[in-house]
């Protein structure tokens, strides 16, 4: 889901109910989603910096012939999310990874932006400190629409920085 527990596909719910282990960023967030949809499965939290021993646990489950689902706190695993490290290591060990598409914040915002999105740039999350001004300089100098993710708590700060870098825009 992309911030609303109802933004989830029937297929995603089926996968979650049929898998043997659910890998998540934060068990508290995953438990809320699973509770809402009456799903009870073992959870393994792998936060921002994936610990090798936790990824080894995922590989052990896969080696035993079981199925693992990867979730994220909001959005799509691997898109500006720590899930990419898990996926990379699972693929490197020869396991097949299948995407389960669903709602996307990126697609949602582009659909209502009111600008030509034939071509655009996605930047992920801006750095918190070092490199922040450089990140936003690239944003204001872009000739195509730029989309990036950000916490609602930093939006005003971002707008102030953008205004100082490109007051004419």
Spans of features found by a protein language model:
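Short glycine-cluster motifs
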Residues: 63-122
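Short glycine-rich anion-binding loops that position phosphate/pyrophosphate groups of nucleotides
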Residues: 2-4, 73-77, 127, 152-154
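Beta-strand/loop-alpha-helix module characteristic of Rossmann-like adenine-cofactor folds
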Residues: 107-169
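Conserved helicase motor
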Residues: 45-52, 125-127
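Glycine-rich, flexible N-terminal cofactor/catalytic loop recognition
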Residues: 1-48
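Short active-site oxyanion
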Residues: 16-22, 94-97, 145-146
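Alpha-helix capping/helix-boundary segments
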Residues: 28-30, 75-76, 105, 154
């Amino acid at each position: 889901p992309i911030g609303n527990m109802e933004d989830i596909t029937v297929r995603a719910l089926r996968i979650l109910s049929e898998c043997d282990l659910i890998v998540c960023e934060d068990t508290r967030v995953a438990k809320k989603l699973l509770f809402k949809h009456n799903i009870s499965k073992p959870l393994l939290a792998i936060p921002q910096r994936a610990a090798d021993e936790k990824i080894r646990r995922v590989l052990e489950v896969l080696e035993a012939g079981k199925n693992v689902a990867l979730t994220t706190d909001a959005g799509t695993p691997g898109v500006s999310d720590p899930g990419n490290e898990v996926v990379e290591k699972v693929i490197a060990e020869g396991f097949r990874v299948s995407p389960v598409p669903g709602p996307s914040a990126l697609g949602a915002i582009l659909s209502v932006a009111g600008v030509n999105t034939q071509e655009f740039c996605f930047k992920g999350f801006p750095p918190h400190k070092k490199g922040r001004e450089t990140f936003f300089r690239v944003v204001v100098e872009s000739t195509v629409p730029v989309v990036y993710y950000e916490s609602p708590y930093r939006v005003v700060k971002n707008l102030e920085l953008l205004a100082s870098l490109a007051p004419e825009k």
